[in-house]
Curated annotation (Swiss-Prot):
Domain of life: Eukaryota
Protein name in the entry: Basic phospholipase A2 acanthin-1
Gene3D superfamilies attached to this UniProt entry: Phospholipase A2 domain
EC number: 3.1.1.4
Source species of the chain: Acanthophis antarcticus (Common death adder)
Length: 119
């Protein structure tokens, strides 16, 4: 679920940035998304959005699906491989958290979602 995703983000970036920092970033971080991603971090969010879209096609409610995971050496690790939905959603979130941790964060890309760059 989204709270667990927030925990994974903190795990992967060693607590350097809260998940709230990503809510209104670029064209894809936060609710919805459109246009061309503005940078690598926004591309991570687009990939995560697409992954959630695939989860919804599988009848998994990704925003509300709880799963089991742990933080091992600053890497989120999923434990729910037996449940198709839980495992899929956990993998989406873990991949995005790792992607966020590697991508540069550009403060100039906060709050641009309503601008023409995201049309």
């Amino acid at each position: 679920d989204l709270f667990q995703f927030g925990g994974m983000i903190g795990c992967a970036n060693k607590g350097a940035r809260s998940w709230l920092s990503y809510v209104n970033y670029g064209c894809y971080c936060g609710w919805g998304g459109s246009g061309t991603p503005v940078d690598e971090l926004d591309r991570c969010c687009q990939i995560h959005d697409n992954c959630y879209g695939e989860a919804e096609k599988k009848q998994c409610g990704p925003k509300m699906t709880s799963y089991s995971w742990k933080c091992a050496n600053d890497v989120p690790v999923c434990n729910d491989s037996k449940s198709a939905c839980k495992g899929f959603v956990c993998d989406c979130d873990a991949a995005a958290a790792k992607c966020f941790a590697k991508a540069p964060y550009n403060k100039n890309n906060i709050g641009i979602g309503s601008k023409t760059r995201c049309q």
